[in-house]
Amino acid sequence: MHARSALLYVTVALPPLVLAAIGVTHPIHLTSASAEYWRNLHIAILPIFPLLAFAPWILVRGAGVVLGWVVGVLGFLYAAFYTALDVLAGIGAGGLAYDGMGMATSTVFGLGNHLGEVGSVAFIAAVAVSAGSCIVRFRTAAIPGSVLVSVGAILFLNAHIYFPLGVVGQLCLALGWVWLYFVVERAARVHSALRPHPVESAAQPR
């Protein structure tokens, strides 16, 4: 496996795997006892959530400029609005609860959830476009991976990374993206092998 190919596998699989691992430890409820860990956990994963947007874009790079832009814009919307959820309902709410102002958390939870929903819907749309493009291009080979990433994106909408459904959703994303990238890479290798290569004739001495 080439280094570039290995890097792309890591790019599509590592962010959801990290979120799944962290999700196992995520408190189900925000309380005074869990507030400090809740806050610190969301600070730690602040740069991880936006990385989920790379996988659907990577899968459509070879499907045309228009699809690349559509998925790119949807990924940007996801990253912007879901980060707001992480900051407000994660870092902000955890900080308020830790400082004894738990009565104010309902406000930041409400704002965060509304903004995060916009981001999650944009993510579902990006995943749907990317998976649909793979099915159109690669037919049945892309169906298992497309189903996995679609399930993962839908679970992400409401379960986020909470255990168990949120963790399952992130694992579905990781496995599905790896499956789809394998299909894309295999098709690229076959296409390259079938492409005629010019043969250079050796110069004949006079």
Positions of PLM-derived features:
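Hydrophobic, aromatic-enriched alpha-helical segments typical of multi-pass transmembrane helices
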Residues: 1-200, 205
